[in-house]
């Protein structure tokens, strides 16, 4: 129901207020901030190559999906296997790896939660 209400508000705002609505996929609009930097420097989307470490879900809270839709591509890395399976399916132009990056070769514990954004190697 909430999605329907949001869609109606979106359509009404475009029709009645002539607003240009740009959708952000990032959690706090980081993709739109980066996009403004790219635009001000006249960087073409096809020339953008990203490296998304800790990519998470390929759509929800994604810092790179906005650019992927515009024609950019890159490498996504995430320790959560299910996220990488989704990346490979939903974003086939990207190269996706399922591993954990760190600054040592020690074996570490990976704590997995129902909300994957909370997954961590930290006990705290």
Describe the predicted segments one by one.
Residues 1-124:
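Phosphate/nucleotide-binding beta-alpha loop and adjacent structural elements of enzyme active sites
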């Amino acid at each position: 129901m909430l999605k329907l209400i949001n869609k109606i508000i979106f359509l009404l705002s475009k029709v009645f207020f002539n607003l240009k609505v740009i959708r952000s996929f990032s959690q706090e609009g980081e993709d739109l901030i980066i996009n403004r930097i790219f635009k001000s420097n006249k960087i073409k989307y096809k020339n953008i190559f990203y490296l998304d470490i800790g990519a998470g879900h390929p759509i929800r809270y994604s810092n790179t999906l906005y650019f992927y839709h515009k024609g950019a591509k890159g490498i996504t890395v995430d320790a959560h296997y299910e996220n990488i399976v989704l990346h490979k399916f939903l974003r086939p132009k990207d190269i996706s790896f399922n591993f954990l990056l760190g600054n040592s070769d020690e074996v570490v514990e990976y704590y997995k939660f129902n909300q994957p954004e909370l997954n961590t190697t930290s006990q705290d």
